[in-house]
């Protein structure tokens, strides 16, 4: 498991791509593109617009409040756990699998906000990733070699931590 230390959190408050203040503005950049989405509202907006993403990462919440309505039953469904402020190996692996097998929803039990980083690392060149920027709009991230490099740089901000086993905790 990897966690994002407090000293690096400010880096993740800035959009990692181009910020659009309305969803309608973003739609004109999507024809002919492979689209991945991170977040329930962005994914639901794509579905309502008749442009389902090839890969979606959702957690059933928006701004920490329950959010119903993201359901793509014909897609492969992956269920992973991921805490706020972190990236589990399961989530990282799921982004790699989904990026190579489109038609996948990653349902996160916990929080999916930081999943854009490993998703950008694994997404094919030319893919567009959309995610919400709370209170501001939608971020469009075009996957280029430079963006992949930036995602890898951001990934190094996370510190690997080990979760002790019960035997380690109790010295058994």
Curated annotation (Swiss-Prot):
Where does this protein act, in terms of pathway? Cofactor biosynthesis; coenzyme A biosynthesis
Under catalytic activity, the entry for this protein gives: 3'-dephospho-CoA + GTP = GDP + CoA + H(+)
Which residues are involved in binding GTP?
A: 40-42, 59, 112
EC number(s) on record?
Answer: 2.7.1.237
Keywords of the record, alphabetical order, are: Coenzyme A biosynthesis, GTP-binding, Kinase, Nucleotide-binding, Transferase
* Task of the protein: Catalyzes the GTP-dependent phosphorylation of the 3'-hydroxyl group of dephosphocoenzyme A to form coenzyme A (CoA).
Spell out the protein name for this chain.
GTP-dependent dephospho-CoA kinase
Q: Which organism is it from?
A: Methanospirillum hungatei JF-1 (strain ATCC 27890 / DSM 864 / NBRC 100397 / JF-1)
Taxonomic placement:
Archaea, Methanobacteriati, Methanobacteriota, Stenosarchaea group, Methanomicrobia
